[in-house]
Amino acid sequence: MVHALRETYRVLKPDGLLIDLRPAAVHRRVGFTEGDGYRLRWVMRENFDDDHAADRAVAHVVNDGFFKAEGRTRFACYRVMDTLDDFQEWLKDFINKGKFPSHDWLVRRVGRAPEVSDGKSSIVVSAPLVLRTLRKQR
């Protein structure tokens, strides 16, 4: 990733801005809608090796003086799915893209939850996103 960041540096105009928007390296939470919010029921088990490597790469190009960190904010992101099928499809895609371990245990638990069988609640996956702004230096 350091190579990609250096290539970004090369093509950015002087004083250009790099936007780094990624999910935070925290386990996603799964629950159900409840009133205006949601109720947490389970926590996923992701591996964050790639996330930590990306953080190190960003720190590396900042420490080397290619970019200056100008801002950082963290905000909530909610993915709402109306059916168990929607959740299973999202989870399968999520696991395949990230090469994460199977979460069949989670699908079984969500499928057995009364909130799914009554059809009155949506399934919610929450995870924060981190937005960083980096300014090209030199």
Region annotations inferred by a language model:
Residues V43-R72:
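Active-site capping/gating segments
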Residues K13, L21, F32, D49-V58, ...:
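Conserved short hydrophobic patches within well-ordered secondary structure
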Residues A24-G31, H52-V61, W105-R112:
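Low-complexity, flexible helical/coil segments
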Residues N63-R138:
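Conserved Class I S-adenosyl-L-methionine
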Residues T8, D20-R22, M81:
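Long, contiguous hydrophobic alpha-helical segments, chiefly transmembrane helices and signal peptides
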Residues V2-L17:
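A short glycine-rich, Lys/Arg-flanked "PGG" loop and its adjoining helix->strand segment in the class I
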